Amino acid sequence: CCAPSACRLGCRPCCR
């Protein structure tokens, strides 16, 4: 999964 910072850039899926 992607870190919160990467999620903002459109990386998926995001970690929780």
Curated annotation (Swiss-Prot):
Presence of the UniProt keyword Membrane in the record: no
Disulphide-bonded residues: 1-15, 2-11, 7-14
Superkingdom of this protein's organism: Eukaryota
Compartment(s): Secreted
Main subcellular localisation: secreted
Notes on the domains: The cysteine framework is III (CC-C-C-CC).
Protein name as it appears in the record: Conotoxin mr3c
Species annotation: Conus marmoreus
